[in-house]
Amino acid sequence: MDSPATSGSLTVSFSPHSGDAFPVGLPVLSAAPVESIFAGAVPCGHSGDFALFRDGPWLLGRARVAPGSDLAQTSAQLYGQLLDAARGWHLARIWNYVPAINASTSGGLEHYRAFSQGRALAFERVFGPDFKRAVPAASAVGCDATE
């Protein structure tokens, strides 16, 4: 079987008309280079680095930050902002795109592990030592993006 044709980088958008589209550093595997999810979402503000959107009962957020030199600290800060923005909401799902996910940090820790440490610290700060009960489904997808 032939592999799918790729062209450029996949771009994700909550709504085709909201102007929030952003490249995620993944190859395009279909004819559509822009993936619109929650196509009815409308912008409803900002919180820290997050742009926020509403689609019916759903609160959606998107943040894009350069990882900097300390990925654990950056992910802890960003997840802290996410948890602040989502206070009073039940988090159902979080998607993360982590550049060079299997590469090592300057301290020798794999990017994914550093990202996960920061994420866990943010949840523990908000929910305490029993934070695992509050963690939603999540994914960390490796990508070629530099931020």
Residue locations for each model-derived region?
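Short, polar/acidic, helix-capping and beta-turn segments at strand->helix junctions
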Residues: 1-147
